[in-house]
Amino acid sequence: MIEAVDTLLVDVPTIRPHKLSVATMNAQALVLVRIRCSDGIEGWGEATTIGGLNYGEESPESIKVNIDTYIAPLIIGMNANEIAKVMNQLRKTIQGNRFAKCAIETALLDAKGKRLGIPVSELLGGRLRDELPVAWTLASGDTKKDI
């Protein structure tokens, strides 16, 4: 059973200012979500957006408030193993809030993977690759310097 849902708003400093067309970021704000289950297992999820409300209708601050105020009370007491039921309840009851819902789903998957002793990738059908390509964003405002 889901016993508690905790959120933490974190600002991760950037190496250098990250200049976007809509904002300059000196830190990346994100929300960490911890779901504590009655069997002692904890699952972690994350929600992040870029540039406050410039990226979409959710900001890190609204994600935290909406999880704390609306989502957590709705899912506390539900079966943490029944992820589809939890997510269906959220879909039926709460409009939008895709980033917040994703963080909840990720935390539930993390908890279930820990409970079963397998990585989340196995819960989702198995790992497809051993490494991922990395993108380096050129966003200092000085393209020549970035390159």
Segments from the language model and where they lie:
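N-terminal capping/lid subdomain adjacent to the active-site entrance of alpha/beta enzymes
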Residues: 1-147
